[in-house]
């Protein structure tokens, strides 16, 4: 049985392009961190939470009712989003309110929907 190799054995054809693009590439660690960020958007509940928080700051109980899941499930997802600096929180008496960490998060969600709905 032949083993197929997918490694390109050709020489550089457009060295100027390769060098130009190479100078604009980020570090491998940056790509790993970006991939980790995008993984957070791979869960529908987390994306729904982010979209809801784009509309208004909300507490765990209200998010749970809105999305039809348990408070525990919402808290679990919010922890992941908080650790990635996608959401922030503030306390008011016994209630914790969550909101998007900054406008960049809103832009990511908005661009995602824009891409989804393009014709």
Model-flagged regions — what are they?
Residues 51, 76-77:
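Base-recognition residues in the alpha-helical recognition helix of bacterial helix-turn-helix
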Residues 73:
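Residues in the helix-turn-helix
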Residues 99-119:
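Conserved segment of winged-helix/HTH DNA-binding domains
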Residues 1-41:
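N-terminal leader segment of winged-helix/HTH proteins
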Residues 26-70, 96-103:
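N-terminal helix-turn-helix DNA-binding core of bacterial DNA-binding proteins
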Residues 82-92, 99:
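Beta-hairpin "wing" of winged helix-turn-helix
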Residues 65, 76, 82-83:
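Alpha-helical residues within the helix-turn-helix
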């Amino acid at each position: 049985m032949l083993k197929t190799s997918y490694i390109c054995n050709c020489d550089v054809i457009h060295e100027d392009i390769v060098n130009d693009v190479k100078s604009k590439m980020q570090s491998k660690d940056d790509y790993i961190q970006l991939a980790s960020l995008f993984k957070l958007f791979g869960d529908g509940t987390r994306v729904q939470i982010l979209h809801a928080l784009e509309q208004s700051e909300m507490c765990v109980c209200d998010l749970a009712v809105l999305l039809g899941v348990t408070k525990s499930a919402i808290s679990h997802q919010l922890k992941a989003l908080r650790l990635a600096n996608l959401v922030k929180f503030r306390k008011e008496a016994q209630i914790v309110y969550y909101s998007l960490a900054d406008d960049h998060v809103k832009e990511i969600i908005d661009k995602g929907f824009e891409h989804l709905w393009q014709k």
